[in-house]
């Protein structure tokens, strides 16, 4: 276990903007890049991707903030090997500013931990969400990258954070249930004017990941009018399971493992693509998501 330390970050004393401030204005207040990792279903590796992506972004000296957006039952601190003295509940309860909850994670990244077992924080009311987004925007200005690990599902708090972020990364696996839930999440984001970037996890081959992404994009394009672009595939890799069991991110514990290499490639793409755009595909049907993927 690492000994967590509070990170001294100056807090702006400017008056808070009114609750009517919209998400677009909050997003413009962020100087660095912001990524939200979202999934429609739990158990697809979302938190693991968020943690390891944050660490991959930090490899070249970037200042990275990792936010556990599952405020009621997150696990970012566990995967980082931390036992923080404070978490986001202290801020939401008014005990300290948002920066006062930060701990130092692996490679010096800043980690904003969530609470554990606080059911009252699973969904924040509108004024609290507005306050959080404003303060998170202020805090994010001090970092080159902010990576937010969102709760699974389609709650209002998670959706607000997904809309706030510049780049929503939608994670799924080839599992039919995961694909169906990912499609539902993409549909909600599309209704709010956002097209996520797709990452397919736990693929047996690169061809399998590409085929899953093609079918997903075809279905989304036909029904939603916007197709998520495939931004990466992550292989099924025992190194990821071993690292999780040891509470050690795999990009640190197994830097040469195939999954670590792919996460670094994803981080590189995020850093070099100024304005990533989704791609258009021919029309399709939702049932196309569940057709078997041919063997490579």
Residue spans of the language-model regions?
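Extreme N-terminal, non-catalytic leader segments
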Residues: 1-44, 55, 62, 96-100
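P-loop/Walker-type NTP enzyme "switch/lid" segment
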Residues: 39, 66-141, 238-249
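G-domain G4 guanine-recognition motif of GTPases
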Residues: 40, 173-174, 196-211, 233-240, ...
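Hydrophobic positions on the alpha1 helix immediately C-terminal to the Walker A/P-loop
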Residues: 49
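Inter-motif core of Ras-like GTPase G domains
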Residues: 138-141, 155-176
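Conserved C-terminal guanine-recognition region of P-loop GTPase G domains, centered on the G4
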Residues: 179-193
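Beta-strand-loop-alpha "switch" segments that mediate conformational coupling across diverse proteins
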Residues: 224-251, 263
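NTP-binding/hydrolysis catalytic cores, primarily Walker-type P-loop NTPases
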Residues: 247-296
């Amino acid at each position: 276990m690492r000994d967590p330390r509070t990170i001294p970050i100056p807090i702006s004393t400017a008056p808070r903007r009114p609750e009517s401030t919209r998400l677009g204005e909050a997003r413009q207040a962020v100087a660095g890049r912001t990524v939200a990792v979202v999934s429609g279903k739990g158990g697809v590796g979302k938190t693991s991707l968020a943690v390891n992506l944050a660490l991959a972004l930090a490899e070249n000296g970037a200042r990275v903030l990792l936010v556990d957006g599952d405020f009621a039952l997150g696990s970012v601190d566990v995967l980082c090997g931390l036992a923080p003295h404070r978490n986001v509940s202290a801020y939401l309860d008014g005990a300290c500013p948002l920066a006062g909850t930060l701990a130092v994670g692996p490679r010096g990244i800043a980690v904003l931990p969530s609470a554990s077992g606080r059911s009252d924080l699973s969904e924040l009311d509108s004024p609290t969400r507005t306050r959080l987004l404003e303060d998170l925007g202020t805090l994010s200005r001090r970092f080159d990258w902010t990576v937010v690990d969102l709760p699974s599902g389609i709650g209002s708090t998670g959706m607000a954070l997904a809309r706030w972020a510049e780049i929503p990364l939608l994670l799924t696996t080839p599992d039919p249930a995961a694909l169906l839930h990912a499609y539902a999440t993409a549909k909600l984001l599309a209704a709010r004017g956002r097209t996520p970037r797709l990452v397919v996890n736990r693929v047996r081959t690169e061809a399998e990941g590409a085929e899953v992404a093609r079918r997903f994009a075809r279905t989304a394009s036909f029904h939603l009018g916007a197709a998520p672009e495939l931004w990466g595939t992550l292989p099924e890799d025992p190194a990821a399971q071993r690292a999780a069991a040891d509470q050690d991110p795999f990009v640190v514990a197994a830097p040469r493992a195939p999954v670590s290499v792919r996460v670094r490639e994803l981080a590189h793409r995020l850093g070099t693509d100024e304005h990533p755009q989704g791609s258009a595909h021919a029309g399709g049907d939702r049932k196309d998501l569940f057709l078997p993927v041919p063997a490579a």
